[in-house]
Each structure stands twice: as C-alpha cells, then as structure tokens.
C-alpha cells in the first residue's frame, strides 16, 4: 500500500489559478506538492479519522489564499477554494 497523496484541484479552481502569473502558479503548486508529500509521510495522520472542521489554508505572496482539506480516506489533498485575499 502506498502512502502517497495526490493533489485534486477542480476545473473551475484550475482556471482561476491558470489566470495568475507564472510565479504564483509555481508557488501554489510547490506548496500543494509539499503538503501532499507531508501527508503521505505521516503515518499517524493516515490512521486518524477524518475530522470535520475548518479547512486549512495557506497564502501566496500575501495576495492569494488557498483553502484545502486532507482526505485520508481517498488519500487526496483537495483544494476547496482559491482567491485574492480581501482587503481590509
């Protein structure tokens, strides 16, 4: 059995990411690959039940916010939302 997690990005979210600069796209991809690699390496997380709670997030260049969830059942890092950080 493999411990590898895959990254899942919906078509609509892929389109939003695709409209960004190359450096933003690269940073998003790097972060998601790192999260997937870390999730696959964590044996404790694989045995823990999927908890329903607030989704996790990270920021790229202080201007973009990415919400994601780690689904241990399907072994995926699922991107839930991507967008510009609201001003304020």
Task: Report the location of each language-model feature.
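A short, surface-exposed loop/turn module that caps and links secondary-structure elements
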Residues: 33-60
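Enriched for short, Lys/Arg-rich terminal
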Residues: 1-7, 15, 19, 23-30, ...
């Amino acid at each position: 059995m493999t411990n590898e997690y895959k990254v899942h990005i919906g078509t609509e979210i892929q389109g939003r990411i695709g409209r960004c600069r190359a450096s933003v796209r690269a940073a998003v991809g790097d972060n998601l690959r790192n999260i997937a690699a870390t999730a696959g390496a964590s044996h404790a997380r694989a045995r823990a039940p999927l908890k329903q709670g607030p989704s996790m997030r990270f920021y790229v260049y202080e201007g973009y916010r990415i919400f994601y969830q780690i689904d241990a059942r399907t072994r995926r890092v699922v991107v839930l939302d991507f967008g510009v950080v609201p001003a304020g």
